[in-house]
């Protein structure tokens, strides 16, 4: 499965722990969306990342190629049981993203990838620890400087 990560799953240490052996396909951008923090996590002590439609905005991230085992592990971490399950914290949806620096020239510029969408909203600013995990991943994957700067301006709960 192609998976578009834009939150803490950008962080290489977190992804290595959750999905050992995952494959990075490339840097990608989701157009006409913005990064938001629509769900509060007790594990992270604040809001966790999601995206909302927003004209003129973009969300940067990474596309990973995940095995079925990786997907099952990520589903557990993200609170996804099965499509439409009332106990899901998130649903998985598919979205078109643009690969800006694919690792392999044979990969199409636009790909359809899955991402996690919160089922309910309980917005909160992120914790400093959570935002730092995103920023560390964004730096590791060389997301654009202006996007890194925007991440650094996000207010935190602490």
Predicted features and spans:
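Glycine-aromatic micro-motifs
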Residues: 1-158
